Amino acid sequence: MSEALIGGGAKKVYILSRRRDVLESAAAKHEGILIPIQCDVTSKASLQSAVDIVTKDSGYVNLLIANSGTLGPTNRLDHDLSIHELRKNVFDNVSFEDFNNTLSVNTTGAYFTMLAFLELLDAGNKNALKGGFGGPSTEGGAPSIQSQVIFTSSLGAYSRDRLSPPAYSASKSALSHLAKHASTNLAKYGIRVNVLAPGLFPSEIATLMTANRDPATENLGDRMFIPARKFGGAEEMGGTVLYLASRAGSYCNGLILVNDGGRLSVMLSEY
């Protein structure tokens, strides 16, 4: 995402992560443009520290992507098990702490990230009115590209398939509704809220679903068939983010954009 934004002309991109080594490695590729900030989204103090750094450095943001995520417990409601085995798998073998931590990172952490940056997003709109990015297309008008939050949800938010881990699915489903709620209630302030719900893109979280697979060789009879016959890649993700961030996507607010190669259309889902 950050690579796409920089390639699209972003003057500065702040990247937040708990892992300093990941931050420093990413920032080294774009020194002075990609700014690393160590941050834990489950800590209000850490979020405030990140906000303070951005406030001091630039004073505003035009776009906030809340991309935090953890898979959490992978114990599923597997109907190949007996009812005794099923209970043991999902009750005895999963702790309240592990289940709730999934929601803490994926839902609460993402939501509080948005809340922490509200004033900086508002400042982004004010900067646009002064001639900055997203300035009015007509004199005296509103910003042509209003400040925006993009929440990264997931295909899992809409999945009813037994392969979907319940904690992860619940956390992303909750996030999608929080985003819709926020888009309604932040409209007064000119802050847009949209959701990106990706399917299978190779990543740490997706390893369980992508390892030892070649979607190009699969067909409709395969349980995890993807109609596009490929996993998502940098172009699909980067292009989608650029669309939402640009004038082309400036009319989107409260949108759930599913980017999944058609996977949702061939599985048990709620979408």
Curated annotation (Swiss-Prot):
Pathway in which the depicted protein is active: Mycotoxin biosynthesis
Any Pfam family hit: adh_short_C2
Alphabetized GO MF terms: oxidoreductase activity
Positions of the catalytic residues: S153 (proton donor), Y168 (proton acceptor), K172 (lowers pka of active site tyr)
Additional remark text: Trichothecenes are sesquiterpenoid toxins that act by inhibiting protein biosynthesis.
Biological role stated in the UniProt entry: Short-chain dehydrogenase/reductase; part of the satratoxin SC1 cluster involved in the biosynthesis of satratoxins, trichothecene mycotoxins that are associated with human food poisonings. Satratoxins are suggested to be made by products of multiple gene clusters (SC1, SC2 and SC3) that encode 21 proteins in all, including polyketide synthases, acetyltransferases, and other enzymes expected to modify the trichothecene skeleton. SC1 encodes 10 proteins, SAT1 to SAT10.
Name of the featured protein: Short-chain dehydrogenase/reductase SAT3
Organism: Stachybotrys chartarum (strain CBS 109288 / IBT 7711) (Toxic black mold)
